[in-house]
Amino acid sequence: MIDFGNFYSLIAKNHLSHWLETLPAQIANWQREQQHGLFKQWSNAVEFLPEIKPYRLDLLHSVTAESEEPLSAGQIKRIETLMRNLMPWRKGPFSLYGVNIDTEWRSDWKWDRVLPHLSDLTGRTILDVGCGSGYHMWRMIGAGAHLAVGIDPTQLFLCQFEAVRKLLGNDQRAHLLPLGIEQLPALKAFDTVFSMGVLYHRRSPLEHLWQLKDQLVNEGELVLETLVIDGDENTVLVPGDRYAQMRNVYFIPSALALKNWLKKCGFVDIRIADVSVTTTEEQRRTEWMVTESLADFLDSHDPGKTVEGYPAPKRAVLITRKP
């Protein structure tokens, strides 16, 4: 059973303590009524993983844990088998005691694009919205963050996160809650909020931006990464039934239009930090994610377009501040 008690105890002693007025009841309701049919199978995989304290832990350059003495072939096989029970692995990669989890996304490449543009994360309390397996949270801790809290309602991601955490010596500097941002009160408590790969899935993107703002302290920093298209400040793509085979894509603005959206929501010091085309080297099928990936979603005759005929995925990073 995945236990959130450590997180409750942690925030009871800091500036997130007011969250305890609503959070335990939400989690209890989730545990009682909303668990996925495979959740017990996934959580069992976490439970059966060995308790290991890493001798060497690198979260600054990667997510890598090593033991002082190499694990036996049997120990490595046990870890690999249990981690494979948590497939598909989409966000990573992870290198854990000789088990190399080659995820669908090279999330380390995204982090390398984002990190140089951030305010110093040292000592910060961070919220990562739509955090997936939690890869970027570990990198935030590696960059000096005091606490990283991730929210993502996908329960497989929760189990992947808890599996990695266990293999990192039960590290308590990062926590994942199985919630969506609409379930959070206006905490106004985070120094930095990340929303990466979420905005285009929201039916109301401006409402999402307001929700992000409500989580920030005054002068806090928002890091927003999302799909964009080329165009001026009035350009927004509203895809039909699907975009790159995804049904739940609603609005894809230009970076300039997105800048205006942020301005409309009251953000200041808005910067377009990076714009990059997503390549089939960054998002691809692997042994740890064996179903379709980006190459299958692009036009086989024109990789500059999706199979539906829209511009191929391009992502922008915007960084801004709540006054």
From Swiss-Prot:
Keywords: Transferase, tRNA processing. It holds the Pfam family Methyltransf_9. One of its GO terms (molecular function) is transferase activity, transferring alkyl or aryl (other than methyl) groups. Its EC number is 2.5.1.-. GO terms for biological process: tRNA wobble uridine modification. It catalyses: carboxy-S-adenosyl-L-methionine + 5-hydroxyuridine(34) in tRNA = 5-carboxymethoxyuridine(34) in tRNA + S-adenosyl-L-homocysteine + H(+). InterPro entries: CmoB, Mo5U34_MeTrfas-like, SAM-dependent_MTases_sf. Carboxy-S-adenosyl-L-methionine binds at K91, W105, K110, G130, D152, P153, T154, I181, E182, M196, Y200, R315. Transmembrane segments: none annotated. Disulfide bonds: none annotated. Catalyzes carboxymethyl transfer from carboxy-S-adenosyl-L-methionine (Cx-SAM) to 5-hydroxyuridine (ho5U) to form 5-carboxymethoxyuridine (cmo5U) at position 34 in tRNAs. Homotetramer. Belongs to the class I-like SAM-binding methyltransferase superfamily. CmoB family. This is tRNA U34 carboxymethyltransferase. It comes from Shigella dysenteriae serotype 1 (strain Sd197). The lineage of its organism: Bacteria, Pseudomonadati, Pseudomonadota, Gammaproteobacteria, Enterobacterales. The gene is cmoB.
